[in-house]
Amino acid sequence: MRGEIISVGTELLLGQIVNTNAKYLSERLALLGIDIYFHTNVGDNEERLKQCLKIAYERSELIITTGGLGPTVDDITKETIASFLNLPLVESEEAKQEIINFFERIGQKPTENNFKQALFPAGSKILPNKNGTAPGFILEKEGKIFVVLPGPPSELIPMFEEHVYPYLKRFTSETIKSRVLKIFGLGESKVEEMVRPLLQGSNPTVAPLVGDGYVTLRITAKGKEEEVYEMISQVEKKIREILGEYIYAVDDEEMEEIVIKLLQKRGFTLATAESCTGGLLAKKITDVPGASKVFNLGVVTYSNEAKEKVLGVKKSTLDAHGAVSPETAKEMAENVRVLAKSDLGLSTTGIAGPSGGSPEKPVGLVYVGFATPEKTYVKKLMLSGNRDRIRTRSMLHAFDMVRRYLEGRQID
């Protein structure tokens, strides 16, 4: 089944509200095997909404609208759909009573315009709204299905789950599933080049996407529930054979979660000493439940004096090489490891910008130190972007060094 979503509301076009409804609906409809080919945002304007409905009617079997079901004059979705389909609006006594009951529960009286929400195009299946005053409805006409939902997510989601999802499930026996592989250490163009033959497939499909400092490959398959996972697994296996060590996580997993799991599995502990990342490493680690079992200490030593007094970085090192140097990164990692009595020590020092750079040490220069029981590694990074981007990428590189070590892989 081909479907599309029309989101109604001038506030969406002005950027005052983020359209989370379209994301939620697309994800849920994919589980039903319904292909959503188009998302449209349109303001509270009858003529423009009619144009959108006309286009959708010609190309889609399922048309879902969100928003525009309120009691005010600019809430015109129902009226516009009724006019577009040449259907009269009919009052529902049941919906009207529900509106009265809703206001009684909150100790108020409905105004006359509230009862506008009890009007529906003739032939509609009315969807009760337990969380507001705007019922939705489903309408089938000439082989097309219209699903009309309120805009607030707190009303839309329960209505969809309780009424719309079971209703649409009757029309399909397929599902659409996806798996996302997260890749670090390779750029998008390189990833695409390495897996290019797999990008040509139609089912499953493989699509590269750029994240904040990493690349993802989304594998999507459509078919019977029992078939799609096998289809995805076969393609994933081929991708892992090509990219192997660069794949660090699947779906919603984050780099820090993987690091914590590996530390727990190996029985290792970690301590961090940060300068340019300003506590970002420690923050990300402690966001993960159970981190206290493997994370001993996190310190932010921003000044040279703090590096010297707290971490014991030698004054001669700072004088000779400066705070942003491989020598300082090395001592920071080694010394925090000893200070915390941890198995591993991780450090960052660099210039995140926008100021502070020089021709010899430009903005984006970062050194990551990683001390292990066997040896200490120092990685030089030349990063681009704004301050947050440089800090985030420094964090990912640091955690990736830990991941590689714990997985027994080569540390670049």
UniProtKB/Swiss-Prot annotation:
It comes from the Bacteria. SMART domains: MoCF_biosynth. InterPro entries: CinA, CinA-like_C, CinA_C, CinA_KH, Competence-induced_CinA, MoaB/Mog-like_dom_sf, MoaB/Mog_dom. Belongs to the CinA family. This is Putative competence-damage inducible protein.
